[in-house]
């Protein structure tokens, strides 16, 4: 039952966010307004920006993780050198 509620909650949040963003005064400048993107990717990105736990204006602050090159293992140099070059790159 909780799985069915998640899409409904996301849709409600998207609608609320769109309502909040569009509620400002119309601009009276001579510059063109940026056209609003309505694709699913844009909506998802807008929702993520809205929900990001950040209080500064520089962007989201992500906590550091302990992921390094040893987490998944390093590439072996021999395997990299044996690969064929990509055919779509001009040489």
UniProtKB/Swiss-Prot annotation:
* UniProt modified residues of type Tyrosine amide: 72
Keyword set, alphabetical order:
Amidation, Amyloid, Cleavage on pair of basic residues, Disulfide bond, Hormone, Secreted, Signal
UniProt cross-references to SMART domains, sorted A to Z? CALCITONIN
Q: Which Pfam families match?
A: Calc_CGRP_IAPP (PF00214)
Q: Which GO terms describe its molecular function?
A: hormone activity; receptor ligand activity
- A GO CC term? extracellular space
Give the UniProt record's GO annotations in the biological process aspect.
amylin receptor signaling pathway
Tell me which stretches of the chain form a coiled coil. Answer: none
Covalent S-S links between cysteines = 37-42
Q: How does it assemble?
A: Can form homodimers. Interacts with IDE and INS. Interaction with INS inhibits homodimerization and fibril formation.
Q: Which family does it belong to?
A: Belongs to the calcitonin family.
Q: What is this protein called?
A: Islet amyloid polypeptide
Tell me the organism. Answer: Bos taurus
Lineage summary: Eukaryota, Metazoa, Chordata, Craniata, Vertebrata
Name the gene that codes for it. IAPP
